[in-house]
């Protein structure tokens, strides 16, 4: 079920859904519950909610960058983002493999995905701040 929901979140990101739409989940734990989760199930849920928050931030940054790229560059950017998502999934599958089948697997996987997603947001935001002389930095339209 979570794999299907992840697919839906990714599809929504690529379709440009509003971050607030992505953050809505049924029975989401509260911030207080996540500050001191009492069970592994709650830790898994909190890690998943953190991933959704990171995904919402990614969606916002992704949309901002894509909207400022001309045709061919935009196509290349979108292709790179699909490849990045595949990388993130594979990296987190690997990272969580040490606890595969255990009750903490979901938590480890969602924490990994949130961490990698936040790192990508930093990279996307940097695209708007190219230092003078950096020819490898993609300059966005204003």
PLM segments and residue spans:
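N-terminal alpha-helical modules
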Residues: 21-142
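Bacterial N-terminal signal peptides
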Residues: 7-20
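Positively charged n-region of N-terminal signal peptides that target proteins for export
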Residues: 1-5
């Amino acid at each position: 079920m979570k794999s299907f929901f992840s697919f839906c979140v990714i599809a929504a990101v690529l379709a440009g859904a509003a971050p607030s739409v992505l953050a809505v989940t049924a029975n989401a734990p509260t911030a207080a519950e996540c500050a001191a989760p009492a069970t592994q199930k709650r830790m898994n849920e909190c890690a998943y909610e953190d991933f959704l928050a990171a995904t919402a931030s990614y969606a916002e940054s992704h949309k901002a960058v894509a909207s400022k790229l001309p045709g061919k560059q935009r196509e290349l950017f979108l292709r790179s983002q699909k490849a990045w998502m595949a990388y993130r999934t594979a990296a987190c599958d690997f990272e969580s493999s040490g606890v595969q089948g255990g009750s903490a697997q979901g938590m480890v996987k969602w924490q990994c995905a949130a961490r990698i997603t936040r790192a990508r947001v930093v990279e996307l935001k940097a695209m708007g701040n190219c230092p003078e002389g950096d020819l490898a930095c993609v300059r966005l339209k204003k």
